[in-house]
Swiss-Prot record:
Keywords: ATP-binding, Chaperone, Cytoplasm, Nucleotide-binding
Coiled-coil region(s): none
Main location: cytoplasm
Binding, ATP: V18, G60, V61, G62, K63, T64, E65, D255, E320, R392
Annotated source species: Aromatoleum aromaticum (strain DSM 19018 / LMG 30748 / EbN1)
Function recorded in the entry: ATPase subunit of a proteasome-like degradation complex; this subunit has chaperone activity. The binding of ATP and its subsequent hydrolysis by HslU are essential for unfolding of protein substrates subsequently hydrolyzed by HslV. HslU recognizes the N-terminal part of its protein substrates and unfolds these before they are guided to HslV for hydrolysis.
GO CC entries: HslUV protease complex
Gene Ontology annotations of biological process type: protein unfolding; proteolysis involved in protein catabolic process
Molecular function terms, GO-annotated: ATP binding; ATP hydrolysis activity; peptidase activity; proteasome-activating activity
Similarity section: Belongs to the ClpX chaperone family. HslU subfamily.
Gene for this chain: hslU
Gene3D superfamilies associated with the record: 1.10.8.60, DNA helicase RuvA subunit, C-terminal domain, P-loop containing nucleotide triphosphate hydrolases
Name recorded for this polypeptide: ATP-dependent protease ATPase subunit HslU
Length: 442
């Protein structure tokens, strides 16, 4: 769990997301409260529950990215789910309980990867020994004598060559774990856990068996390292730690929550929409979900719901769900200045990405300040005239702007391109001004 203070968390989020100070502040406080709660003694600690967040704002302004970056900072199990994927119990579709089951799967996978990293060096040594045993088999015994061991200096020479990659392309016969049996099982929605259990039974049928395969040493070393690492970690500990991480630090991002908000008192599809909201209630309030790794309590999982709320209003959500999302944050639409910052100031800004991509073909891409300003203005104008898709508009505009150079890059004599305002206007101004073209091309 991170011990960063809220200002430090916001500063870290600023490296990747432009603006949206209110939303960053809200999630930073929520993350810090996780740490604060851990310092409180029982029995009061178990009474302190996270304050769930409702983010309201148009698409492409950073709602999802804020939650995703927050989960990375916290090193916490994180899942992003569209609320529209789920249906009321009794209807055809996915059950909301699968959110927690999927989160548990993610936590186990992440925990296993972390555990394998800690034993990677020992696993690599063991894998090298097995490869060397195959390369340098001991001499066969004569009569009752023991087999003669290989000279240690010879073994060390081969180990050195192995580590330097000189033997990677040589083929050897090596004993590796046989691949587990796999069976693709199709089942009706809502029975995902049953299919997972049946698949697990099939996989266990072939577990523990080994077979001799002819492989290149480079491939064999990787396969054996993974096999040895899996043998060195305690899988039961990994699963128990994953369940604890989900219960104490899990973050669920519920996107498109406005799409399940009922916009009228009518019947029809709204029945199922309200049903999804009612099914979400116990999950958000705190309940116990059965998973294949054990029972998971959702009392201390942080839920961040988000939606554009173009057609519906937050008040259209059922009152019980509104009460369980006490912190509301409104995200602003992006301005021309925001677009400029997105293009140049974030850690992995678009300008840097395209410069790195074209540098692989030997092309130096340079952007002038007026060129970047013009790009930002065109992206903003197109958003205003057509649908506002936020920062995602920059991807479309940049692709169109650099389409020609991306196609021609690598040609002899083409090693530098300066992108200034006239260059941007020459390629994008007509498209931006004509609404019919902007709607379909940009």
């Amino acid at each position: 769990m991170t011990q960063m203070t809220p200002p430090e968390i916001v500063s870290e989020l600023d490296k990747h997301i432009v603006g949206q100070g209110k939303a960053k502040k809200a999630v930073a406080i929520a993350l810090r409260n996780r740490w604060r709660r851990a310092q409180v003694e029982e029995p009061l600690r178990s009474e302190i529950t996270p304050k769930n967040i409702l983010m309201i704002g148009p698409t492409g302004v950073g709602k999802t990215e804020i939650a995703r970056r927050l989960a990375r900072l916290a090193n916490a199990p994180f899942i992003k789910i569209e609320a529209t994927k789920f249906t009321e119990v009794g209807y055809v579709g996915r059950d909301v309980d699968t959110i927690i089951r999927d989160l548990a799967e993610i936590a186990v996978k992440d925990g296993r990867e972390r555990a394998m990293k800690t034993v990677r060096d020992r696993a690599l040594d063991a894998a090298e020994d097995r490869v060397l045993d195959a390369l340098l088999p001991a001499a066969r015994p004569v009569g009752l004598n023991e087999p003669e061991p290989v000279d240690s200096s010879t073994r060390q020479k081969f180990r050195k060559r192995l580590r330097e990659g000189e033997l990677d392309d040589k083929e050897i016969d090596i004993e590796v774990a046989a691949q587990a049996m796999t069976a693709e099982i199709f089942a009706p929605p809502g029975m995902e856990e049953l299919t997972q259990q049946i698949q697990g039974m099939f996989q266990n049928l072939g577990g523990g068996k080994k077979k001799v395969r002819k492989m290149k040493i480079g491939e064999a070393l990787k396969a054996l390292t993974d096999e040895e690492a899996a043998r060195l970690i305690n899988d039961e500990e990994v699963k128990a730690e994953a369940v604890r991480a989900v219960e104490q630090n899990g973050i669920v991002f519920l996107d498109e929550i406005d799409k399940v908000a009922s916009r009228s008192e009518g019947q029809g599809a709204d029945v199922s929409r309200q049903g999804v909201q009612r099914d979400l209630l116990p999950l958000v309030e705190g309940t116990t979900i059965s998973t294949k790794y054990g029972m998971i309590k959702t009392d201390h999982i942080l839920f961040i719901a988000s939606g554009a709320f173009h057609l519906a209003k937050p008040s259209d959500l059922i009152p019980e769900l509104q009460g369980r999302l006490p912190i509301r944050v409104e995200l602003e639409s992006l301005s021309v200045e925001d677009f400029q910052c997105i293009l140049t100031q974030t850690d992995a800004c678009l300008v840097r990405q395209y410069q790195a991509l074209l540098a692989t073909d030997g092309v130096t891409l340079e952007f002038t300040d007026d060129g970047i300003r013009r790009l930002a203005e065109i992206a903003y104008q197109v958003n205003e005239k057509t649908e506002n898709i936020g920062a995602r508009r920059l991807y479309t505009v940049m692709e169109k702007l650099l389409e020609e150079i991306s196609f021609e890059a690598g040609r002899i004599g083409l090693d530098k391109l300066l992108v200034d305002a006239p260059y941007v206007d020459a390629r994008l101004e007509i498209l931006a001004q004509r609404e019919d073209l902007a709607r379909y091309v940009l």
